[in-house]
C-alpha cells in the first residue's frame, strides 16, 4: 500500500504534532504556515546533533582526536554541499551564518575589482539581495510584470543598454513574497551573453527543488540552513574563488590569515580568508544532516504534492469575498508554496493574530523584508 505523502513527509519533521494553546484555553495541533520565514528541524538533524555533540571540538586548532574529527566533518561537508547543488569542481564553499551574510561577502569582494560597474537587482528581491549592493555599486532594478514575474525583456533591455558595464545580476531563485520561481536558465543565458555574472539568492528555492549550478549557469549561490529544516545558524556561499583572492575579507580575525606582523597581513586563500573566527561547527553538522535527508527524498514527488496543496489552498481562498491574492495565477506550476493575500479593511497583523490565537495557525505578516 502506497504511503500517503502527508504522512510520509510529516514524520520527518520535529514538532509538527505538538499541541498549542488558543485564546479560549483549548488546545489544537499547531499549523506551521510560516515555513518560508524559518522551518522546524528534521528529526534526523536533531539526532545527528545529539550524536555528534559528545565529539565536538575546535577545528583547525589542534591535533586532539575530537578536533581532527570535527575538522574532517567541517571540510568534507564542502564536498557534500557542492554535490548537492551541482557546483563546478573548481567552485569553493564558504560557510556563513545565513544567506544575508553570504551575499554581503560577495558584495564586499566585488567592490575591489568592479569599480564603476553596475549591479542589476530586481523588484522582487528580499532586502538581503538589495541593500548589500547599494553602498559600493551603481544599481538598477529589473521590473516585474502584473503577475509578479520577472520581465525578461526588461532584463535584456538593461543588459544591452549598459553596454557591457553590468558586472553582476543578483536575483532570487524564488520570491519570498509570491513564491514565483524564476527561470534561471533563461536569465543565465542573457546575463552571460552580455558579459556579466549571475548570483542566485537560493534561500527559498534550495529546499524545494534540485539545483544544478554548473548546468544552469549559476556563478554564485547563497542559501540558509534555517529554511531547509536545520535552524541552527548556518548557511553557505558557493562560487568561483577568483573574486575572493584579491580582496580584503568581509570579516577580519583569527583563522583567516597565514601570517601577521605589526605592519603586514598575509590573508589565507579562499574559502578560509572569509571564515574568520571560530565557526559554527554544530550548525554545519545540522546543515549537512538536512542535506542528507533531502537527498533521500524524491524531490519530484515533493514538488507534485506541494503543487496539489497550493492548488487546494488557493481554490479555498478564492471563495473568500474581497480577498486579494498575489502571485497566484490560475496555473501555478512555477511556484513554491508561498501564498500572499490581503483582506479588505483588516490590518495584516490582526489577521495573523486571529489565525494564531483562534486557530493555532502560524503565518508571516508584514512587508516580508521585501520593500520598497
Describe the residue ranges of each PLM region.
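Pyridoxal 5′-phosphate
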Residues: 1-372
